[in-house]
Swiss-Prot record:
Annotated region described as Disordered, given as residue ranges: 32-58
HAMAP family named in the record: Ribosomal_bS21
Protein name listed in UniProt: Small ribosomal subunit protein bS21
Species the sequence originates in: Moorella thermoacetica (strain ATCC 39073 / JCM 9320)
PROSITE patterns registered for this protein in UniProt: RIBOSOMAL_S21
Amino acid sequence: MSEVKIGKNESLDAALRRFKRICQKSGVLSEARRREHYEKPSVRRKKKSEAARKRRWH
């Protein structure tokens, strides 16, 4: 769980930006989107191979 403590002279906007950055780096949102719906193992493998193929040629 990402947690941000606001400093004495820190604005709420700055703390929110820091929280968003921490969440983005830890991959919380992308993981939540990935797990939003169940994905069959065969579909997961297919997506993985597609991504590898894409990385190889681009």
